[in-house]
């Protein structure tokens, strides 16, 4: 299945050491009908994924460099930082090509296609549809977002009940990231990659060791810790559910 008129795709990355994760990810994504592409971090991963035929995969720049991710996978290791720089760069590159990209970690199991909700199109978005204006989770507010990120709160019902108090000021988890190919979406993802790969010397990003840390620092005031200083009232939920 191609990205089609929606120009939307899911993108994930992995090497041969997490091949079981990659195959499991692709199995569920394919069963759910999600347009997805796997960026192979090494040649071995590409060869094994390509041998399955139905998996859309390609060699990332690191695969051409015969790169290997060290066993520790510490965020402070040089090999991890190279991986993070490549990953953010590839996401940015696809967004710049005009595609809305949902970046997903490989250890996530997708049971349903998120496209109808994220793109807010088709029958699901119409009045009376699953994500229509009268739905508990209408898709229209998210459609206007240039960037969206998951949090460590895994329950949408809990989020609604709590009026998004944690989401508004908690830690943002880069395990699921949505970047739209809008002018602001393109600018943000380009800056995200820049701040991960080549942070300005002496900047707040220079000392950070992961793309998640960089993302959180980009959307918060300097020295504002997650959960401290953020608005904790129900302003976010009221904007989505004015009733």
PLM regions with names:
Residues 20, 43-97:
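Active-site-proximal specificity loops/subdomain of glycosyltransferases
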Residues 1-9, 21, 53-54, 124-128:
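Juxtamembrane luminal stem/stalk of type II transmembrane Golgi/ER carbohydrate-processing enzymes
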Residues 28-35:
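Short, acidic, metal-binding catalytic loop of nucleotide-sugar glycosyltransferases
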Residues 36-41:
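Short internal beta-strands
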Residues 1-17, 70-79:
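Glycine-rich phosphate-binding "P-loop"
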Residues 59, 83-159, 169-171, 176-181, ...:
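GT-A fold catalytic core of metal-dependent nucleotide-sugar glycosyltransferases
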Residues 169-243:
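Catalytic core and acceptor-binding pocket of nucleotide-sugar-dependent glycosyltransferases
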């Amino acid at each position: 299945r191609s990205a089609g008129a929606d120009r939307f795709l899911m993108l994930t990355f992995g090497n041969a050491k997490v091949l079981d994760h990659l195959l499991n990810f692709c199995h569920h994504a394919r069963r759910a009908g999600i347009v997805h592409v796997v960026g192979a971090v090494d040649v071995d991963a590409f060869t094994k994924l390509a041998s399955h035929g139905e998996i859309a995969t390609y060699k990332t720049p690191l695969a051409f460099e015969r790169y290997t991710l060290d066993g520790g996978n510490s965020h402070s290791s040089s090999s991890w930082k190279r991986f993070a720089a490549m990953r953010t760069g590839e996401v940015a590159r696809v967004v710049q090509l005009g595609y809305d990209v949902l970046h997903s970690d490989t250890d996530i199991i997708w049971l349903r296609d998120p496209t109808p909700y994220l793109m807010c199109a088709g029958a699901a978005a119409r009045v009376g549809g699953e994500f229509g204006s009268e739905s508990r989770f209408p898709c229209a507010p998210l459609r206007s977002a240039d960037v969206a990120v998951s949090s460590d709160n895994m329950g949408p019902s809990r989020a609604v009940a709590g009026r998004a108090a944690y989401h508004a000021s908690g830690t943002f988890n880069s395990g699921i990231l949505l970047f739209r190919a809008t002018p602001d979406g393109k600018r943000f993802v380009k800056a995200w990659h820049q701040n991960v790969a080549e942070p300005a010397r002496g900047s707040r990003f220079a000392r950070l060791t992961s793309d998640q840390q960089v993302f959180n620092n980009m959307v918060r005031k300097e020295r504002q810790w997650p959960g401290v200083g953020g608005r904790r009232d129900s302003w976010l939920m009221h904007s989505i559910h004015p009733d």
